A protein has these predicted regions:
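Acidic, surface-exposed loops and disordered segments
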Residues: 1-210
Length: 210
C-alpha cells in the first residue's frame, strides 16, 4: 500500500541540508492541512509559513537551538485560537451557508448549540480544544509531505510564549502549539537517518472489542 510505504519512509529528520522545497510541494502540503477534518468544521487555528531566515534565526534559540529550525526550507507554525468567540463561530457557519447556497435548520440549530456552549467556557479549556484540532491538520501536513518526498520534523520543544511574541500571535488571538520544519534530510549529519523505525506492535497498540 503506497500510504504505508510513505509512512515507513518518513521519520523525524534531525538535520536538514538547507535545500529549498518547491512552492508547489509546499502548497500541496498546506492544502492537505487545510482539508483536514476538525471538530464542528470550525478550523480553529491558523498556519503561519515562515520563509524569512531572520525570523527562523530568532525562533531557533527559543526552540532548544534545534538546527532544523534554521536549516529547513519552510517553517510551519500551527497556531490555535486563544478561545472560541461568537464572532469566530458565526464566521465559519456563515461561510458554510454561503458556499452551500442555502440554510439548513438542523445546521442552524447546531450553530446555536455551539454558541450557547463554547464562548462561555474558560479560555484555556477552549485553547486546548482548538490546539487538538490544529494537531489533526499538523498530522495531515506530515503525511502530505511524505507523499511529496519531503522531510519534516514535528517539534513541541519550544517556548510558545516566545514564539508568539516573535510572530505577534497574541495580538491576533492566536497561540502557537506546534512547529513543523519542512525540508530535506542531511544524510551526513543526521544521526537518525539510517536507524530502524521503532513502533509498538499492533498487538500492543490495538485492542479489539468484539
Amino acid at each position: 500500500m503506497e500510504l504505508l510505504d510513505k509512512l515507513n519512509w518518513r521519520y523525524a529528520a534531525k538535520a536538514m541540508n538547507g535545500q529549498k522545497v518547491s512552492e508547489e510541494k509546499i502548497a500541496n502540503i498546506i492544502e492537505a492541512a487545510r482539508l483536514a477534518p476538525t471538530s464542528s468544521g470550525l478550523q480553529p487555528f491558523e498556519i503561519i509559513v515562515v520563509k524569512n531566515q531572520a525570523i527562523k534565526e530568532a525562533i531557533r534559540p527559543v526552540a532548544w537551538n534545534q538546527s532544523m529550525i534554521t536549516d529547513c526550507s519552510h517553517l510551519l507554525v500551527f497556531a490555535a485560537w486563544d478561545t472560541y468567540t461568537e464572532e469566530r463561530i458565526n464566521k465559519m457557519f456563515d461561510l458554510t451557508n454561503e458556499i452551500r447556497g442555502f440554510k439548513n435548520e438542523g445546521w442552524e440549530n447546531y450553530r446555536q448549540m455551539l454558541l450557547s456552549n463554547y464562548p462561555q467556557k474558560d479560555a484555556e479549556e477552549n485553547f486546548n480544544h482548538a490546539a487538538k484540532q490544529a494537531y489533526i491538520a499538523f498530522s495531515a501536513a506530515i503525511i502530505a509531505a511524505a507523499f511529496e518526498g519531503v522531510d519534516t520534523t514535528p517539534i513541541e520543544g519550544f517556548d510558545p510564549a516566545a514564539v508568539d511574541k516573535i510572530l505577534g500571535l497574541r495580538e491576533k488571538g492566536l497561540r502557537s502549539c506546534v512547529l513543523l520544519p519542512i525540508g530535506y534530510r542531511d544524510t551526513d549529519k543526521d544521526w537518525l537517518v539510517n536507524l530502524k523505525k521503532v513502533r509498538k506492535s499492533t498487538e500492543d497498540l490495538v485492542t479489539i472489542v468484539e
